[in-house]
């Protein structure tokens, strides 16, 4: 009789859109399930790699999809290998870019890496942190300068010899730029090879990535094979659509929710996400069964917003945020129409935030407005304003929005 196939656990399948080496989902599924079973029998945790280049300072919910999957591997007893790409960040991943990236300094990269680790939960308990930094054997944090900075010229040439120009141009970003006559710097061809070499250096069994990383993850498999290692599995997750429901979540597109935004700001943004995205947000950002969501579209949005906010701040904070958001809109009265109006016709634009508050009478003076903003008491449509000098260029950007000072003072902005 044929052996009963090993089933891949639900936590691993959740949100997954691609798994290779095999082009056949069932084959790759079965192979990884077998590898998991072997690891359990041999008491040898899998080494699960995720690389991040610290090219910015903030992590948003779009980034968190991969960290959540990495945490799921940790909770299943495996070893997460988080690679801080302090060397590769100097080149910059060309994936998704139509031009050569601006190179960062070592100081900028290290400052960004420090903020990344803090946001992921370094120094926090495992219960509160996105990654488990405290349980022995569950996390290795490595910087790829450990192995890449010491490569000599013959070794670099050897790496280059494992790939062809044709392979590189088959990568969509490079191919598009080449076809359009947009320059490709030679050092950019090195990036996929260096990311692949990271897998060799840490002897990865699995590499996590977004769907846009398939070329780079596959390069890791090729290099592991070249160095006589057992090739890693590539497990790919989708790119999260931003709050606009159109483009990927990206700070440059102003459609993000920060990983550690305060509960009210997070909830207020999420409850406005287009209904078409609600199920994917639930699958990728929570442990909630999407089948448990209400049928009514508005209630679905609220349920998703609570679930995602709770995943970061706890259910009590999420429910409090929902109540606060409702009061913000209603002014603690019967309906939103009853919120007192503040008129922008007498405000001189461009207007800084502290001036706006005093000009419409929400604060008695500019100095009071500055104090309120710095104290975290001012919100615009639920999003905290933290910079007194934040500038609004035109009144049309504020029309219909609710400006809040403290817990009880609201004004709907109008002409």
From Swiss-Prot:
Enzyme class, broadest EC rank: ligase
Subcellular location: Cytoplasm
A Pfam family of this chain: S4
Manganese keyword on record: no
Keyword Cytoplasm in annotation: yes
Keywords (A to Z) from UniProt: Aminoacyl-tRNA synthetase, ATP-binding, Cytoplasm, Ligase, Nucleotide-binding, Protein biosynthesis, RNA-binding
Short sequence motif 'KMSKS' region: positions: 248-252
Residue span(s) of domain S4 RNA-binding: 351-415
GO BP terms: tyrosyl-tRNA aminoacylation
Domain of life (superkingdom): Bacteria
Binding residues for ATP: 251
One GO CC term on file: cytosol
Family assignment from sequence similarity: Belongs to the class-I aminoacyl-tRNA synthetase family. TyrS type 2 subfamily.
Function: Catalyzes the attachment of tyrosine to tRNA(Tyr) in a two-step reaction: tyrosine is first activated by ATP to form Tyr-AMP and then transferred to the acceptor end of tRNA(Tyr).
Subunit architecture: Homodimer.
Protein name (Swiss-Prot/TrEMBL): Tyrosine--tRNA ligase
Species annotation: Prochlorococcus marinus (strain MIT 9313)
